[in-house]
Amino acid sequence: SVHYDDELLGRVIADLKAKGEWDDTMLVVTADHGQSFNDFGRNYWGHNSNFASPQVLVPMIVNGPGVEPGRVEGMTSHLDVAPMLMRHALGCTNPLSDYAMGKDLLAPGIDHPWVQSSSYIDYGIIEPDRITVVDGTGQWDIVDRQLKPIEDAEFSPAVFEAMQWFRQFYR
């Protein structure tokens, strides 16, 4: 499938160049999830079964006017795509908080202290050293980034911050 995706992407780029639109186009290629192959020996395969890095880290390629080659090392979210596009593709200059929850992916040093990720029924608050997983009934577990339970762990301040952040959607 990667070969086929590459072929299709090549066609899109060739078409944009043929129409003279390539130099004015911001192209973003990414995925909605990663894939587990029993990476941590905990029998997780596929996707949508946990919030560890093999399932939530996705590749992203961004090309366009003013986009410098580089790699983002900090913790980011797909919520950061819209602010990037609004600022760099559409030229919006007002504060990002006027229209988005995320940050500009092209801003130097972008690195969230936590990000939220969801599956069909669960969500996770992902921090550099832990993941707090909350299921559809409100039951929770705290695991390390390799999915090993952290015994007697308490909620970090990030979980409370995330709950406040979520409230704006559930009033």
Label each region the model flagged.
Residues 2-5, 9-12, 26-34, 60-62, ...:
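Beta-strand elements within well-structured catalytic alpha/beta cores of enzymes
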Residues 14-23, 64-171:
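Membrane-interface soluble catalytic domains
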Residues 17, 21-67:
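Histidine-centered active-site microenvironments of extracellular/periplasmic hydrolases
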Residues 1-4, 53, 70-77:
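Extracytoplasmic/periplasmic, Sec-exported soluble proteins
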